[in-house]
Amino acid sequence: MGSPVHRVSLGDTWSRQMHPDIESERYMQSFDVERLTNILDGGAQNTALRRKVESIIHSYPEFSCKDNYFMTQNERYKAAMRRAFHIRLIARRLGWLEDGRELGYAYRALSGDVALNIHRVFVRALRSLGSEEQIAKWDPLCKNIQIIATYAQTELGHGTYLQGLETEATYDAATQEFVIHSPTLTATKWWPGDLGRSATHALVQAQLICSGARRGMHAFIVPIRSLQDHTPLPGIIIGDIGPKMDFDQTDNGFLQLNHVRVPRENMLSRFAQVLPDGTYVKLGTAQSNYLPMVVVRVELLSGEILPILQKACVIAMRYSVIRRQSRLRPSDPEAKVLDYQTQQQKLFPQLAISYAFHFLAVSLLEFFQHSYTAILNQDFSFLPELHALSTGMKAMMSEFCTQGAEMCRRACGGHGYSKLSGLPSLVTKLSASCTYEGENTVLYLQVARFLVKSYLQTQMSPGSTPQRSLSPSVAYLTAPDLARCPAQRAADFLCPELYTTAWAHVAVRLIKDSVQHLQTLTQSGADQHEAWNQTTVIHLQAAKVHCYYVTVKGFTEALEKLENEPAIQQVLKRLCDLHAIHGILTNSGDFLHDAFLSGAQVDMARTAYLDLLRLIRKDAILLTDAFDFTDQCLNSALGCYDGNVYERLFQWAQKSPTNTQENPAYEEYIRPLLQSWRSKL
């Protein structure tokens, strides 16, 4: 029998003391951290409410996530379902509204480690695509958990390309029913969360066939499991898709439908209807059915994707002031690794972009709320820009947050590879966001189509076609352009107008270049589809630069609103400057390409950038403290507020089942190996 690890009695003295190396970082504050937290929360009242909810959540042992790193897939699923169950009980007892802030704060406190998250997506889709009658019928059933619903769109053979979905919904006028069917193996619904074990109903996206004509993708409410004993209903083949990189708490599933019949009323009908005789009535645009995806993407940005990078920054920054390595001077003690410029270069751009993304997500949410109401009232004028912004920001944020979290993990050295650091799970969660709700390359190319259309609109002669005004996000396409950057010294690159103009210049050039390549191919005889395919790399580059411009512009506009907070405005401006200049240095070839920047100016930008690293260093811990994540929410041995990294890491390691159970390989393999060698000695 293998012996348990030797247990050292640490007591809890260390857990009541602040590590001096992190305490010193908080001693001299150049700005009010609490006030910045209030700004990030959208007001002091929201901060107070969030902390109240977090206090409630963390007071219940049912919500503990501390053993997550040692659990099996089944244990994670059951624990997540337990949390979902108890959240519903608390919400009902305390009167938390389904759309209120409290449930969002509870989700944040638990790091999203809760079951039935796709149930909420179903509700969003119902409210976006359903008629008032359908909402009145199904919404209360969802709210009271009389049914558990999922959103079944992605298939085994198709994902982001929605027009290629194979599941069919054929209308039978004789019975006034839709026959939902998976005609091929690749038509199997694959990946929907809550589908594998939990859901009783699914909102199935399928190709509508009525009166002999295919009408494109529409949404149908389909019962899939018995409400009596949870067994699959007739015609339903259903299960879990198996192991994944992460999200063990979520039962991602598969669904095959074999001529399953649902009533005519189960097709969501806000934007399209099928009359009893099979007549198809179109009430919206072809893009109307994409509205639920827009809703989900906007919510993902601030609710799912961005907080993960923020957590990674908190963990890596705190660990970097505790970890000491080598000496800056031979006579000095070992230095905090955050005092090394190379560590600052790894972490500060991630911190800067997390703030840039925060302010962008806030402005996008405001635009979405205004546009969403208009769309539900049949005003689709905002939809093109809303779609372009939501797809572009989802692609950019998931890409940069994934890269940023991985950079934070590596910046923590070997300990960053331990699950107990919390960082590996953050990285793998973010990795999924690069493909769920739209694969990023495809999303960038959807933005590119919007950019091409917008650019061509600027080239129309005033009298040819009635010109609608450009969308605000691409208004820079008609702004006066500078041929050369006017910067003459490093400090000039700290001017928001200068670097915003620089990003706009490069974006315009790349968009124009992509259009010209497209036109050259079509004029030489290529059809539009082939010409597009042959220029997608150029379009992709243009879309990415446009998205970066949007983040820079959004950050500068957010700073302008902080005139009454000079200390906070100053420290955030440094992050804004760093974000803009880091992007310029990373993509310097794009700025040098047409000599907009000279080599000497790139050197100036680098000088400004390196000086910003030095200035941000003194506020780094405070800027991450402002995110205000609880230790329970971070669930990291490296990132706790008190800085007692090594004590916590050692204590947590002792909880591993491998240290308390018998060695399963000792009797069968290790002992015989050792004895065989002894017999030869």
Curated annotation (Swiss-Prot):
Disulfide bonds: none
EC class name: oxidoreductase
Impact upon substituting residue 225 to W: In CBAS6; reduces fatty acid beta-oxidation activity; does not alter subcellular location
Modified positions (Phosphothreonine) in chain numbering: 13
PANTHER family (UniProt xref): ELECTRON TRANSPORT OXIDOREDUCTASE, PEROXISOMAL ACYL-COENZYME A OXIDASE 2
UniProt disease link: Congenital bile acid synthesis defect 6: An inborn error of bile acid synthesis characterized by abnormally increased liver enzymes, hypolipidemia and low cholesterol, vitamin D deficiency, elevated plasma and urinary levels of C27 intermediate bile acids 3alpha,7alpha-dihydroxy-5beta-cholestanoic acid (DHCA) and 3alpha,7alpha,12alpha-trihydroxy-5beta-cholestanoic acid (THCA). Serum levels of phytanic and pristanic acids are normal. Clinical features include liver fibrosis, mild ataxia, delayed development, and cognitive impairment.
Name of the molecule in the record: Peroxisomal acyl-coenzyme A oxidase 2
Source organism of the structure: Homo sapiens
